[in-house]
């Protein structure tokens, strides 16, 4: 598979494999060192797959309610249509409603992620109240961007976390 950013081929010299981090085999200090050395942590199975499925379906149901998914909506297949703007005059309020489902918050602000971040920072941590949910259908993407400017401001005590709610190729 060819790697592209905004339609431009990424030189193979800039590509490599992601290194997976196993939480059970790492001390807190080793986690911090891995993050500092690699600039990321690739963690699998931090969140229970059942919880991911529930949150995914809750988000998909909200998207289905504005005609953006085909039935069965749990498959997450884009309909190519949308009544979102017709039914919700304020997109911010719509996405806030989607982002505040209990099942999604159980993941984004729950004990599993909180525990990982607390281990990394060495102190108790909490998740943001505001999350940026990116519901993107197959073949589409969120253009290349940098989260640090939006989240970290002038502190090094903020980390962003990307969660996938379906199988993806890495």
List each language-model region with its residue ranges.
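Short, conserved beta-strand element in jelly-roll/cupin
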Residues: 152-170
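Non-heme Fe(II)-dependent double-stranded beta-helix
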Residues: 1-37, 44-144, 150-151
